[in-house]
Amino acid sequence: MDPQNQHGSGSSLVVIQQPSLDSRQRLDYEREIQPTAILSLDQIKAIRGSNEYTEGPSVVKRPAPRTAPRQEKHERTHEIIPINVNNNYEHRHTSHLGHAVLPSNARGPILSRSTSTGSAASSGSNSSASSEQGLLGRSPPTRPVPGHRSERAIRTQPKQLIVDDLKGSLKEDLTQHKFICEQCGKCKCGECTAPRTLPSCLACNRQCLCSAESMVEYGTCMCLVKGIFYHCSNDDEGDSYSDNPCSCSQSHCCSRYLCMGAMSLFLPCLLCYPPAKGCLKLCRRCYDWIHRPGCRCKNSNTVYCKLESCPSRGQGKPS
């Protein structure tokens, strides 16, 4: 019986033909092997041609691991062969994009893609790409730089350290001035009866002592005599006659005076040292007499003042 008479004049038959297994394996092998590009010497460029120096220790920023680009594989589709029964001829049409164009009157099943063909190759490539990403992503932890301190916000301003003068006047405590001399009416505590010295200060960035004693020694060249006696003495403990060259109680008194007499021929300013030393002692006594607030009596009775309104600085005798 004629097939045209059975199915009618407007019917069509679609036959789906799949490629053989040998052709699939051969095509998969050809797609996996990609030709590698060979670069010439002119195309090769130096990545880092210069050194980069930094002022301090720094951590090199490592580039982020690049993910391996996934290779898009064009999967094969089934070969759709439409057969027109009316005209008795075969029209084969292969679609590479997964869509088959059929005549308007023919309605046949269309298979878009076949995922079973490249399953083995895609699973192998995915596993290799994931392993490479895992190795690149595991970077060693950065070690802290020794001596590096973490930055902290300063909340308190630095304060200037104020050093009080050792010979400065101390604050008077009214509770200490309770022992009053019965004869002169002045305080007999240790602070008030201590002798007052001439004022002095530090000059030249706190390196030189400026006082009346140093002015007398440098003005009369006595500092030079002390330096010579210091280098000639054998006493290493520091208690030598170089500190007091004019002292009569220490050893080598005659030799010291003879040496200073010989040096006065070349340094006549040494002859001014005895009168300058006498003037210095007189100035000390005058300054102490004026500025000492305590009692100077040698033999006197002491009265303890219990009243808060009693005079503590010799304003009057206590009753």
From Swiss-Prot:
Keywords: Acetylation, Cytoplasm, Developmental protein, Membrane. GO terms for cellular component: cytosol; Golgi apparatus; nucleoplasm; plasma membrane. It is found in: Cytoplasm; Membrane. PROSITE patterns: SPR. Residues 183-295 form the SPR domain. The modification N-acetylmethionine is found at residue 1. It is a peripheral membrane protein. It comes from the Eukaryota. Residues 69-78 have a biased composition (Basic and acidic residues). Residues 54-78, 100-160 are annotated as: Disordered. Residues 112-131 have a biased composition (Low complexity). One of its GO terms (biological process) is negative regulation of ERK1 and ERK2 cascade. PANTHER family: PROTEIN SPROUTY HOMOLOG 1, SPROUTY. Forms heterodimers with SPRY2. Interacts with TESK1. Interacts with CAV1 (via C-terminus). Belongs to the sprouty family. The Cys-rich domain is responsible for the localization of the protein to the membrane ruffles. This is Protein sprouty homolog 1. The lineage of its organism: Eukaryota, Metazoa, Chordata, Craniata, Vertebrata.
